[in-house]
From Swiss-Prot:
This is Methylenetetrahydrofolate reductase 1. It comes from Saccharomyces cerevisiae (strain ATCC 204508 / S288c) (Baker's yeast). NAD(+) binds at E18, F19, F20, P21, P22, K23, T49, W50. The gene is MET12. It comes from the Eukaryota. GO terms for molecular function: FAD binding; methylenetetrahydrofolate reductase (NAD(P)H) activity; methylenetetrahydrofolate reductase (NADH) activity; methylenetetrahydrofolate reductase (NADPH) activity. Pathway: One-carbon metabolism; tetrahydrofolate interconversion.
Amino acid sequence: MSIRDLYHARASPFISLEFFPPKTELGTRNLMERMHRMTALDPLFITVTWGAGGTTAEKTLTLASLAQQTLNIPVCMHLTCTNTEKAIIDDALDRCYNAGIRNILALRGDPPIGEDWLDSQSNESPFKYAVDLVRYIKQSYGDKFCVGVAAYPEGHCEGEAEGHEQDPLKDLVYLKEKVEAGADFVITQLFYDVEKFLTFEMLFRERISQDLPLFPGLMPINSYLLFHRAAKLSHASIPPAILSRFPPEIQSDDNAVKSIGVDILIELIQEIYQRTSGRIKGFHFYTLNLEKAIAQIVSQSPVLSHIVNESSEEEGEDETSGEIGSIENVPIEDADGDIVLDDSNEETVANRKRRRHSSLDSAKLIFNRAIVTEKGLRYNNENGSMPSKKALISISKGHGTLGRDATWDEFPNGRFGDSRSPAYGEIDGYGPSIKVSKSKALELWGIPKTIGDLKDIFIKYLEGSTDAIPWSDLGLSAETALIQEELIQLNYRGYLTLASQPATNATLSSDKIFGWGPAKGRLYQKAFVEMFIHRQQWETTLKPKLDHYGRRKFSYYAGDSSGSFETNLDPHSSSVVTWGVFPNSPVKQTTIIEEESFKAWRDEAFSIWSEWAKLFPRNTPANILLRLVHKDYCLVSIVHHDFKETDELWEMLLDQA
């Protein structure tokens, strides 16, 4: 059924949800479990993102098709047209239709740069803007697809948009073109400034359409760092009144930040609904593949809580399957029959023995999380049925053992998180790219012609004289200052460092440099470094040195652009390098170095060398240099396991012997 028709048929307020295709197979399986739980929130539809230039095409199509066929919720697949061949567009639309998907969100996507721009011009692609894609779908497929488009309450920005002001009035002209071309609904970019959205909504109703479905895009605040990161990527302003609710003393406390963030989103929804007199009745959540904050928002929101209440009324308050306290009757088992989740008040010795354990080399730690095997998890009770909607919502909110297990990855952790998490990877979910415009890239990094020029770029980043490199625009963390000189020396020697951290032992969670998580905790870190190194330098110098020490002291992963991989660890191994111990809480892990995530990042990291090379014409010195690095260098990740010896990793790397 089309989103347009569903919208007009639904009288009461509702939500919709965006997901992105995870980078790993286990992440995808865990995401499907999560999406099944979140259907209890009765979303009108879900959307699945499409990577720039079709970089996630196969994963997007697979996830969207699986969701359409198994969730009983209409799926809307994103489709970007810029830098995407017409054949890919046609194939995607045909596969969507055959899978039962009838809703498409037509987007332009990131504009091509460098060689891609020249190629797109020479090929005379029919798709330069989203309006071209809308028009093409409507002309080629008629009413087979309900087509949505994006809107920008604060105005659209290209890259860093140097020297350009965001202008929503200017963007309204383009939005009107998309609607006139046949767009059936509109979803906005994320925002936190309600006044700017309400102004935009009035303009939209006055100048474009009185009744076209318009969905405000909302992103829950899961951590302070990623709150700012998401706002920066989306060019969304943050009102001072919201910023003031996150004083410095709580910014590293993810639980406190999330709690305040839930309150803020509830207030935004309430204000939008009231001040539009209910014209805005659907709220689109950018989930980041996470569930806890959204379930809490829906349950506590005066506008949306009827969703939860109606679920309880439909199922009957006396159904034991609907009570979270009785979920011991609904164990979750893996395909081998292992009980990995159990909410009984008294855990039996047998169950304790069957729980899975992990270790951090010298210290064995029990992790309270849902671990998915290669065969996946399933919910079972005596009747073989799923838990009730009320129970599923309670789980998504993080209540009980099942809830804690289901939301074990609830804080986005980027590419150094657990690759089993649906949220593993970049927070935008759109694939690898240089997240600045061409002009900004040239301003930041110039035109590198020699390896010495590349060293200078990495060193300037470490010195703070430039705030980004092609792989990261987040800037440096405070703890990097503790190993700044060592990292600079490594780069002088040709070890181009991408990521690193110093070691620490039992540091307070309130520490101004290392601090994170709830109060009164103790934090631990192993030193690690990730870097690009010439293959010959790796094979003749660094690898023999690491092999000499052995994997109990130093472990490593290494790979190159051809897909090669080597390690001194056992297959499918991992190392937790940052963890915290907090009162009345299981051990929390925030940084993990593991084989599967390394391989996924290896491919992305080398693709960024190629993207950087495309900024320069073929066969120019800069283009040749960057392509040679792509071809001749390795990516190496090294972990030092004795976190009490805080200097040993850096001494080993800088030792000339």
